[in-house]
């Protein structure tokens, strides 16, 4: 009864909106949509708990104009996604066609390097996501224990790998769909609460921060928070090129809306309650000040975020292995191989320290994919795409060399 007496109108708005969003995202209507099934994988990978840490970090760097930084990051990510989508439609027929040419030989070399870079990044990031999930579980419900946290991480990795090996892609998608449905319901109920908060307390009076080279380095690092859209490229064993392209677009539209809306709406909260720390726990603390119910939901949200992101990257890694071995190793074996490497990393390295290398590897992968798109667009005389890719390449070189890892 004491808790009920503490509930405010905002709490009831959060709870009601959460239930309504949950009914929608887990509805048979969405479940029957093939495009939604394909889009869930890149969406799960893009929206980890990164939106929680990117907001205070952007506000710290850009002040009240953080919304412009987030919009720029989302647009840049969409342009990079455009390079990968271009490769799915235009480069893959050259790469995997029967005709030989100098261009094909060059593209195969660049593609191989990019895939190796991505495989390296996936294997670290999957271990990182689940290791972080384990630390959330023990810090939130038990006492922290390094060995028990690694054991839980190992169990989760083996569960995902063995499930994917035995039940294949569609079972992983089934698990992912429910985790993403819960995660999106929490995120959209958070946005609803922030919308109500802004209705009562909107302010654009935050401080203005100087924009310099350090700001650009941090923005480059934050770009890697919205990575994950590339997983659509590696679903070719089950889905057509057109389906993969549409799924990536849909995932980037939804995630872009979430990231930009969240940054815009949370800015007023930061004006009244400046963030003291640059991590996801700070957002959870501030959300608890907005709504008691929201605070509890956000404590649960990161668990779903880390699990679904790990499943999504496992799917991507399995598809990558299938492609890189010229279809000799199926995706189901790829899932098992990926998670076993993850288990080895959990027990042999500190994944919280080596995640920075994964961030650089993701950036390098995007650079190489853009170079492939640049080469193909030049060959096919697609002038507009060639111009866009020409402008993207130096931006990605800067991010590879100078981007600050958010982790």
Swiss-Prot record:
Record keywords: Cell membrane, Membrane, Transmembrane, Transmembrane helix
Cross-referenced Gene3D superfamilies: Amino acid/polyamine transporter I
Intracellular or extracellular location(s): Cell membrane
Keyword Cytoplasm attributed: no
Superkingdom of the source species: Bacteria
GO CC annotation, single: plasma membrane
Major localization listed first in the record, in broad terms: membrane
Name of this chain's protein: Uncharacterized protein aq_097
Species this protein is from: Aquifex aeolicus (strain VF5)
Record lineage: Bacteria, Pseudomonadati, Aquificota, Aquificia, Aquificales
